[in-house]
Swiss-Prot record:
GO CC annotation, single: cytoplasm
Biological role stated in the UniProt entry: IGPS catalyzes the conversion of PRFAR and glutamine to IGP, AICAR and glutamate. The HisH subunit catalyzes the hydrolysis of glutamine to glutamate and ammonia as part of the synthesis of IGP and AICAR. The resulting ammonia molecule is channeled to the active site of HisF.
Gene3D superfamilies reported for this sequence: 3.40.50.880
Organism expressing this protein natively: Brucella abortus (strain 2308)
Gene name linked to the record: hisH
Name of the protein in question: Imidazole glycerol phosphate synthase subunit HisH
Length: 216
């Protein structure tokens, strides 16, 4: 199995690569973790990971600047149905639009917009930085065997914006930060997490291993 982690100038690339290598090794999964900016290598990969940190518009520009990358993603993920994982802004780019300072078109895979978080508790700071529990709304193989909910493991978040999905069925999990905040989305062969699996210790490594095993 070859897993393509897309290098388009955004994301915790070294951390993500190391986390995938560790999760594969500890789970006994034979996987080549391929950090690449080559659209052809992405198109031929068995699984695809799109990381991302920073501003939505900047990440979209970076993706557009990689020759053939958006086309490769649409063909490989939508038409060929290869398993896909978006991380943080990589997840947000799955949406229709980002509304951060300006309107930026996303990939349009998940109906909804990425909007600024407005916690009901004014004492909660933006961005949300740190550890928070996740609450699964719809069961999914990426959460198999992972303790979630009030007594569950914590995931690591760093973000000021959230994906406001139009379809509740696309929201796999939420976290509580002055109200429900989308923590994970998914449908068909694609999933995305607002939190960073590569920084989420046991929860993150378990989720990555589940993604590597997942057969949508």
């Amino acid at each position: 199995m070859r897993v393509a982690i897309i290098d388009y100038g955004s994301g915790n690339l070294r951390s993500a690569t190391k986390a995938f290598e560790r999760a594969a090794h500890e789970s006994g999964i034979s996987a080549e973790i391929d950090l690449t900016c080559d659209a052809q290598r992405v198109a031929s990969a068995d699984r695809i990971v799109l990381p991302g940190v920073g501003a939505y518009a900047d990440c979209r520009r970076g993706l557009d600047a990689a020759p053939g990358m958006v086309e490769a993603l649409n063909d490989t993920v939508l038409k060929k149905a290869r398993p896909f994982l978006g991380i943080c802004v990589g997840m947000q780019l799955m949406s229709e639009r980002g509304l951060e300072k300006t309107v930026t078109n996303g990939l349009g895979w998940i109906a909804g917009d990425v909007r600024e978080m407005v916690p009901s508790d004014a004492s909660l700071k933006i961005p949300q930085i740190g550890w928070n529990r996740i609450h699964v709304k719809h069961s999914h193989p990426i959460f198999d065997g992972i303790p979630t909910g009030d007594d569950g493991l914590h995931a690591y978040f760093v973000h000021s914006y959230m994906l406001d999905a139009k379809n509740a069925s696309d929201v796999l999990a939420v976290t509580d930060y002055g109200g429900d905040v989308t923590a994970a989305v998914g449908r068909d062969n694609m999933v995305g997490t607002q939190f960073h699996p590569e920084k989420s210790q046991l929860l993150g490594l378990s989720l990555i291993a589940n993604f590597l095993k997942w057969k949508p």
